[in-house]
Structure formats: structure tokens, C-alpha cells
Amino acid sequence: MHNKPQMFHPQAEAALANPELRANFRGAMDYLRDKRQTAFADPDEENAIRDRAEAIRQRCLSKLPALLEQLEANCIANGIRVHWAENAEQANALFADIIQSHGGTLAVKGKSMVSEEIELNHAMAKEGIECLESDMGEYIVQLGDETPSHIIMPAIHKNKQQVADLFAEHVPGFKHTLDVDTLIETGRNVLREKFRSADIGVSGVNFAVAETGTLCLVENEGNGRMCTTVPEVHIAVTGIEKVVEFLADVPPLFSALTRSATGQSITTYFNMISSPRKGDELDGPKEVHLVLLDNGRSQAFMDEEMRKTLQCIRCGACMNHCPVYTRIGGHAYGTVYPGPIGKIISPHLMGLEATQELPTASSLCGACGEVCPVRIPIPELLQRLRREAKQDPRPGVPALRGQGAAKSNTEAFIWRSFGLLTSKPALYRMMSWCVTRLRGLMPSKLGPWTRCRTAPRPAARTLRELMAERNK
């Protein structure tokens, strides 16, 4: 199932009409919110962690071009081969070239949202290369031919009955059961067999340290470590914004990430990769490649306000607290990155023409901004994108691809008329008087808003009339 952002409204309606999906999400979201609240029990500590994480991300982004050059130089000095990709097509071509140069036919992949962004699995399949997900949630999603519905818990929309049905359909010899331990063991056994025969290991990167040329990988299942040590060749892929300046920047960001994502003080595994296998080492890959992807990030970087989207450390906390996402899930958005953060990232990746409906799918309640560990002002950025979807590019301001795509001459005329009306007191009083006298002619239905709400009706008298009567 591969949805499209242009179909957001019908996809959202379908999700709302699915009671099983809503029940799955409700339980998962409640659990994750409670875990985060427990992890940040002390408000003063929470604010201190968020302040420090925000400061680190802003400092690193302010030096991004220089840090990327430093990262490249230190990675090369360590023996890591660095590749640059402007877009998804270039990234996939690099992957294909590296894998085919080693005669590879099977790649095992750790969790990586950037690989989802470039649709790596499908691109490699066209080249005759099997790309198998090794994260349990990603593996379940892959079996169902779906995309992840959450950036840290890809199969959060599935319950154990649905997982068991998938295993019964796709895993030979599986005896249908709802026992969670048996389901996990089944997936683990399949994946371990694949690890033994894999030619290539693929992973994402949580933090890339410019100071030391180190790639940091956060995980809980151990599959990331297997992907980066068992195969002879390891390919890491990440967005250019993931670079940090110093090794000392990692622990504060790591603490903010784990507490915000899963409510953990620390994850089960934390991997630091600084080179291929050395002569005196017994394990690890013989080659390590790093693919640095732009794919619209430079455009966001050029805009001082939209640059804040690049602060994201992919924790998913904004999704867990969003009243829209928690009711419709991730697939309704039709984008790789769903929820609040997806609504401000996706326009840079796909253009406003394709994603114009997403910034409007928010109540602007501010919950996302209140829990963001790096204090991205998501509500303010959503309002900016709403304006840009309706307005033509302005001189001197970097324009998003597709800016003005949602512009409507009729809507523009209505707002210009409203502006004129409210700027002329005499005209406004006359129109208010007319509306109150004609209130009985108001239609009972006003589009989708009134499907489950009573249509608002003008008052019988204007405020000016009420105040005049009161002051008699």
C-alpha cells in the first residue's frame, strides 16, 4: 500500500472509518505518551535537556557546509568512502553501483527513514537485488507491502492478529499463533538466516560526528549491529543535516532522543562506527561507504526560518501527541514522514503542489511544539507553509517548489472583499445589520465542517446594537 499526499482527505476519511486501525493507534499512542511523561518527570530537567539539544542543533546547522567538509575529510582519513547524492535517483544509483561492483544480490537493512525516502527497496529490486528489512517492525511492514506508519515504530498500526496472519501467509512452516514471544522468535529466526548469507549491510545514521568521522547508530533490537558488522560491505545513508560538530555533542542529543522517542534513559544498543575492519580485528566489514543525501535539504537550509526543520532528530514525539495523527495514523498522509514533522519536511522533499493539503491538517493546538526535544516551532512553520501554498513567490525569499499551487482567485477575491469590509466602519456596520436581519436564510449545511456539527448562525442583533441598548 503506497498512498499519495494528493489524496490526503479520502485517505484520512478511510482511516477514520477503520475502527481496528483507530484502536491500534489509540493504545500505542497512549503508551508512548505515558512513557515520555515518566522519562521527563522533572519539568526543570526536561527544559534543560531540550534547551541544550536545541542549542547544539542550531550551532551545528549554522556551520553545516564547513562541518560536512570536515566530516568527509575525517571519514576518508578513517578509511570510510564518502559519496554525495543530490536526490533519490543519484542515491539509488550509488547503491546499485556499490552493490553490483561486489557481485551482491542480497542486502540486509537496518532501520533507516532516509532509505524509505529514496525508496531504496524498490529501486534495488529493479536491479535484481533483494533488500531485506531486519528491523522487526520494518520486516512486518515489508511483508505486507506497506510503508512505515511511524518513524520509530513502523508497524504500530498492526495488532498481533494481523502480524500472525502475515506470518502465516509469508513464512513457510509458521503455525498460526497469537503468542507475542513466538511471533518475535519467528521473525528473528528468518532474519538470522538472511544475515548469514547477506553480501551487503545497509543502515541509517542518527548522528555523524565531523570531529572524528564517526557514524552513530541508535537501536534496541541488535539488528543494526548485525547489519554493520556481519556483511563484508556496509553502506550507511543519511541526510546532510545529521552532522554534529563534536563527539561531546552526541550524549545530550542521545538523551533527548531516547527519552522523547520511547521513554528510555538509554537504548539497548548504541553503535559508533569510525572505520572498516582493521588488520588486528576479528569482525566488522571490509568496506564502509557513507552516502550523504541532500534531496531538498539545501533549499530548507537557505531559508533561515525553514532551516529549523533540519533540527529534527527523528524521535516521533510530535506524532505521539498530535490529535490528528493519533486518529488517522501515518498512512493517511501519503508521505514518508507523517504527522506534524512530516507536514513541514515533506514540502521540501516533494514540493508544495503535491503536499499543499498537509499543512492544513492541523488544529494548531501547539502540542507538537511543546514536546519537541529540539524546540522546532512546528505550528509557526505550518502557518508559513499555509501562506506559501496560497501566495506567489516573494522577491528575495527562497521559493519552495510548487509555491502558490493552492492559490484560488475566488478565495483571493473573498479575502480582499473581507479586508475592504473590515477597513471601512460604515460599510461594516451596514453589512452586519443586513446579516443579522437575514439570518433565517443561512443554509443549514456549510460543507464538510457541518457534517457532524451545527452550522453557526449570526446573532439576532449586532454587538453595537447590544452595547447601545446596554448604555441607555
Can you say where each PLM-predicted feature lies in the sequence?
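The feature marks the mature, well-folded catalytic cores of soluble enzymes
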Residues: M1-E305
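A glycine-rich phosphate-binding loop feature that marks nucleotide/adenosyl-phosphate handling sites
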Residues: Q90, T267-D280, R314, Y325-G329, ...
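Gly/Ser/Thr-rich active-site loops/lids in small-molecule metabolic enzymes
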Residues: G224-V243, Q311-R314, I341-K343, H348, ...
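Ferredoxin-type iron-sulfur electron-transfer modules in oxidoreductases and energy-metabolism complexes
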Residues: D280-T309, Y325-P443
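Short linear elements at protein peripheries
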Residues: W433-K472
